[in-house]
Amino acid sequence: MDKLTPKQKAFADNYIENGGNATAAAVSAGYSKRSAQQMGAENLLKPVILGYIAERQKEYD
């Protein structure tokens, strides 16, 4: 399995913590405000990020 980059991990952690706002998670992770919406959407299509989010969400169940 591929590993998350530090920025991808920060995105995923912020996405979980903010209740699922991908744009805000991208900005918090360090993506530019200009590209945050696009990068948030792209990150949610990456299996490695989705897998990490799913594993983290199990901790809350």
Regions found by a protein language model. Give the residues of each.
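N-terminal, charge-rich alpha-helical recognition modules
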Residues: 1-61
